[in-house]
Structures are given as structure tokens and as C-alpha cells.
Curated annotation (Swiss-Prot):
InterPro entries from the UniProt entry: Ribosomal_uS4, Ribosomal_uS4_bac-type, Ribosomal_uS4_CS, Ribosomal_uS4_N, S4_RNA-bd, S4_RNA-bd_sf
GO cellular component terms, semicolon-separated: small ribosomal subunit
Matches recorded under CDD domains: S4 (cd00165)
Organism for this UniProt entry: Clavibacter sepedonicus (Clavibacter michiganensis subsp. sepedonicus)
Designated gene of the protein: rpsD
Listed name of the protein: Small ribosomal subunit protein uS4
Pfam families linked: Ribosomal_S4, S4
Quaternary structure annotation from Swiss-Prot or TrEMBL: Part of the 30S ribosomal subunit. Contacts protein S5. The interaction surface between S4 and S5 is involved in control of translational fidelity.
Domain S4 RNA-binding: 95-160
Amino acid sequence: MSTKSRTRSKTRLSRALGIPLTPKAAKYLEKRPYAPGEHGRSKRKQDSDYAVRLREKQRLRAQYGIREAQLKIAFQEARRTQGLTGENLVEILEQRLDALVVRSGLARTTAQARQLVVHRHIMVDGKIVDRPSFRVKAGQMIHVKPRSEGTEPFQVAAAGGHADVLPKLPPYLEVELDKLQARLVRLPKRAEVPVTCEVQLVVEYYAAR
């Protein structure tokens, strides 16, 4: 799929879910804040409970850019963990390496963060990690491989080039962009995680299956 096709696909999905998944989609939603398609402007019929839960699950999945199987595994772990399942789920997903790379400003989008990880540009505590799903522990340091620091994507990041499109830095991260590094100082809490999702509806979706 070409870059243009991927951008168009993300924009269409953003409109369907009502959330911006990329900076370009955010600008597009400002102009066309309705679902895609012939009847996008018209008032939708009231969705069924199932449709509402399904859309919320799709919202969460799309914001982390993960497959259904990955979300289901995370949900099962969240259900086994003490506390509220929905909050646990978001907190588990937020510890993904690709999520923290974009959250810290080292990448502009989740897709770019995943690419940087897969191409072995990202290290955790001095070791290269090429799995976007890697679970970062509290206290661990995420940083760019020294040989990659001079490349254009990271020079843009070091200059704060993504600040205009990313949410405010959450309190569970300490970031030194000039050094291209970020530390997960403690585990995230749901209320601090900048994702748009009614997590209880996601719990209800899986509970009904």
C-alpha cells in the first residue's frame, strides 16, 4: 500500500471512529467532522448496544495500532490483574514500547514509532529492542541508538518537531529530547493516559462474547 493510500485509509478510519489517528486526520476532521460515505452528513439511526461497544473497542485498538488478537491478550491479562479491568487494560497497553516512543515525542505517530523500533533504532537500558509490543517497566530508560541520533527523523524529534501534534507529556514520563531519551518513572494511571475511550464499554464487549 502506498503512503497516500495509507494516509487516506487512516483518515477514513478516523472519521468512522470520530477520533484523529494521525495529525493529517486531525486537520481533516476539523473540516469534515462526520462519518465517511454518502450519508455521512445525515443523522445516524441510533446504534445498538453491541454497535456502541464494538466501536469503542475499535477506537482503543486503532489508537494503539494493534491487531485484534493483541488487544484480546491484553484484555485477558487485565482481567486477571487486581483492580478495574478497563483501567488495567489501558495501563497495560500504554507500557508498549511503541506507545511510549510516540508519547515521549521521539516519533510523530504510532506507525512511525513502530517503524523506528522494528528497524532497530530504539534501545531500552542500553539494549536494542525491535519488538513494538515490548513491555517497558517502571524505571527503564528508552533512548535512541547512538548511530541513529544524527538521522533526520531524530534530529526533528530532538528539536521538538512533534510538539505541535502530540498531547501534553504525561506525568509518568521524564523526557530529555535533546538527548533523545525518556524514562518511564512509574506505571501509567488510566486518568493520565491521553487516549479517547470509554473503557467500560470495551470490557462489556469482551464480557458478552
